[in-house]
Curated annotation (Swiss-Prot):
A lipid is attached at G2 (N-myristoyl glycine). Residues 86-104 have a biased composition (Polar residues). It comes from Homo sapiens. GO terms for molecular function: protein kinase A binding. This is A-kinase anchor protein 7 isoforms alpha and beta. InterPro entries: AKAP7_isoform_gamma, AKAP7_RI-RII-bd_dom. It holds the Pfam family AKAP7_RIRII_bdg. The keyword Transferase does not apply. One of its GO terms (biological process) is action potential. Residues 52-65 are annotated as: RII-binding.
C-alpha cells in the first residue's frame, strides 16, 4: 500500500525556513495576497475556473504552512527549559512521602 506524504515541498523549502524565523508574519503576508471574488467574476457573478484553481492552490498552500507553523511551535515548546521541573517536583514528592513513611 502506498503512503501519503504531507510534505510535498520541493520548491517551497525557503518558505519553511521563513516559518522558523517569523511564522506569523509569513502567514499574514500570504493571507493578504488572497484577492476578493470580484477579480475573476463571470457574468453570473461566479469566479472563473482559472481563478478557482489559483485560489484553491493558495488555500492548500496556506493550510500546509499553518500546519508546519504549528509543528514548529509544538517542537520548540518541547525543547524549552522548565519541562523537567515537573519531573523534579514528582521526585521531590516521592522523597517527601518516603521520609514521612520512615517516620511512622
Amino acid at each position: 500500500m502506498g503512503q501519503l506524504c504531507c510534505f510535498p515541498f520541493s520548491r517551497d523549502e525557503g518558505k519553511i525556513s521563513e516559518l522558523e524565523s517569523s511564522s506569523s508574519a509569513v502567514l499574514q503576508r500570504y493571507s493578504k495576497d488572497i484577492p476578493s471574488w470580484s477579480s475573476g467574476e463571470k457574468n453570473g457573478g461566479e469566479p472563473d475556473d482559472a481563478e478557482l484553481v489559483r485560489l484553491s492552490k493558495r488555500l492548500v498552500e496556506n493550510a500546509v504552512l499553518k500546519a508546519v507553523q504549528q509543528y514548529l511551535e509544538e517542537t520548540q515548546n518541547k525543547n524549552k527549559p522548565g519541562e523537567g521541573s515537573s519531573v523534579k517536583t514528582e521526585a521531590a514528592d516521592q522523597n517527601g512521602n518516603d521520609n514521612e513513611n520512615n517516620r511512622k
